[in-house]
């Protein structure tokens, strides 16, 4: 019989893998769409390419920030899992 501690740890590991995978795929798709729109805008109006490039870099940074937030949550679930600490505290009572 698997202990509740091991079950929480294993489910957390599975959730972490899914979370970072979805975040990375979503970020990659979003960055591709942003770059595509910028290139199309530059092709239509080359005179504003510097403004479009600046706006694209800001957009890419915001998209990447969401992936980094997901990575922070992943590290919290892996190394400082609040579910495990609550389980240990409940078992000690």
From Swiss-Prot:
Its main location: membrane. SUPFAM superfamilies: F1F0 ATP synthase subunit C. Keywords: ATP synthesis, Cell inner membrane, Cell membrane, CF(0), Hydrogen ion transport, Ion transport, Lipid-binding, Membrane, Transmembrane, Transmembrane helix, Transport. CDD domains: ATP-synt_Fo_c. The chain crosses the membrane at residues 13-33, 58-78. It is a multi-pass membrane protein. GO terms for molecular function: lipid binding; proton-transporting ATP synthase activity, rotational mechanism. It is found in: Cell inner membrane. The record marks 64 as: Reversibly protonated during proton transport. PROSITE patterns: ATPASE_C. The keyword Transmembrane helix applies. One of its GO terms (cellular component) is proton-transporting two-sector ATPase complex, proton-transporting domain. Belongs to the ATPase C chain family. F(1)F(0) ATP synthase produces ATP from ADP in the presence of a proton or sodium gradient. F-type ATPases consist of two structural domains, F(1) containing the extramembraneous catalytic core and F(0) containing the membrane proton channel, linked together by a central stalk and a peripheral stalk. During catalysis, ATP synthesis in the catalytic domain of F(1) is coupled via a rotary mechanism of the central stalk subunits to proton translocation. F-type ATPases have 2 components, F(1) - the catalytic core - and F(0) - the membrane proton channel. F(1) has five subunits: alpha(3), beta(3), gamma(1), delta(1), epsilon(1). F(0) has three main subunits: a(1), b(2) and c(10-14). The alpha and beta chains form an alternating ring which encloses part of the gamma chain. F(1) is attached to F(0) by a central stalk formed by the gamma and epsilon chains, while a peripheral stalk is formed by the delta and b chains. This is ATP synthase subunit c. It comes from Campylobacter hominis (strain ATCC BAA-381 / DSM 21671 / CCUG 45161 / LMG 19568 / NCTC 13146 / CH001A). The lineage of its organism: Bacteria, Pseudomonadati, Campylobacterota, Epsilonproteobacteria, Campylobacterales. The gene is atpE.
